[in-house]
């Protein structure tokens, strides 16, 4: 039995015939995997684009609900306020803790450790980790990593800012989020190293109170997405577009920028002094 590009059973078609709108939420600040666009009031990023294709291929309709943070989004999933979370680590134990069902993964990533190129003076590593992330649990549970001193932040970017400012020595992130942030000029002093022994896959997380047919239908929609389509989505979302500004130029070219600012300041000062001198002569 065919519907769109997917093969559905009669039972699944019966569900689709009367399927309710699926409520979805996301981490609002985890680009490029997921985010929330305030202008359009909808989700953005790799996960949202993948879900758009799932909608095309299955006929399912999704409505996004804003969350303030990943912790808030996860809380909404746990309490069954929403039907789906756009990115949940593909870990069945983690899913069970959060009363969730996992789709097949749509994205696989390696994990990197991010450090400041300027060494810090701490006696031992202070590690910045994001709240409520499965990755945080994986790092803490692994004896290979030094996590005696941990500081928690709400977002991955806040962890990067902590490392940049020297409040922390390192942080951990998936390679997509890390590369997206490291492409920004302000993080030019940070560098990443891939952890060969650790990877993480992202799935859609469904409330465990959802109809089991919904999970099957979404998985079939994901199976219809080609590797070329997924590659295109990833490439479109992973290129950070930095708006040109004076601050950006100062970050990118600090020495030249300081020289230009000093030259402009001296010129303006000379003009001001000249105007004052002319004015004082006229008043005599």
Regions found by a protein language model. Give the residues of each.
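Extended ligand-binding regions for polar small-molecule ligands
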Residues: 1-15, 48-57, 117-136, 140-141, ...
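Inter-domain helical "communication" segments and dimerization helices
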Residues: 6-8, 98, 118-119, 141-145, ...
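Acidic, polar ligand-binding/catalytic clefts
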Residues: 48, 52, 56, 61-123, ...
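A "functional boundary" signal
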Residues: 122-125, 142-144, 159-167, 186
């Amino acid at each position: 039995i065919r519907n769109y590009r997917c093969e559905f059973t009669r039972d699944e078609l019966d569900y689709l015939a009367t399927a309710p709108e699926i409520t979805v939420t996301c981490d609002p600040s985890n680009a490029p995997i997921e985010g929330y666009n305030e202008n359009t009031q909808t989700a953005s990023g790799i996960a949202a684009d993948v879900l758009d294709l799932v909608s095309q291929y299955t006929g399912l309709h999704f409505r996004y609900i804003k969350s303030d943070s990943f912790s808030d989004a996860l809380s909404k999933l746990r309490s069954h306020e929403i039907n789906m979370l756009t990115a949940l680590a593909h870990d069945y134990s983690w899913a069970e803790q959060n009363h969730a069902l996992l789709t097949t993964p749509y994205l696989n990533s390696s994990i990197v450790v991010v450090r400041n190129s300027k060494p810090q003076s701490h006696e031992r590593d202070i590690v910045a980790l994001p709240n409520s992330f499965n990755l945080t649990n994986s790092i803490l549970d692994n004896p290979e990593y030094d996590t005696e001193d941990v500081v928690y932040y709400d977002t991955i970017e806040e962890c990067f800012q902590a490392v940049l400012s020297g409040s922390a020595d390192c942080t951990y992130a998936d390679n997509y989020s890390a590369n997206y942030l490291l492409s920004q000029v302000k993080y030019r002093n940070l560098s990443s190293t891939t952890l060969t022994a650790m990877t993480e896959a992202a799935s859609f997380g469904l409330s465990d109170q959802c109809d089991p047919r919904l999970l099957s239908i979404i998985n079939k929609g994901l199976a219809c997405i080609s590797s070329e389509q997924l590659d295109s989505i990833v490439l479109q979302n992973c290129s950070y577009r930095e708006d040109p500004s004076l601050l950006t130029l100062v970050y990118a070219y600090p020495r030249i920028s300081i020289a230009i600012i000093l030259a402009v300041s001296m010129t303006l000062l000379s003009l001001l002094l000249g105007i004052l001198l002319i004015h004082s002569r006229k008043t005599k």
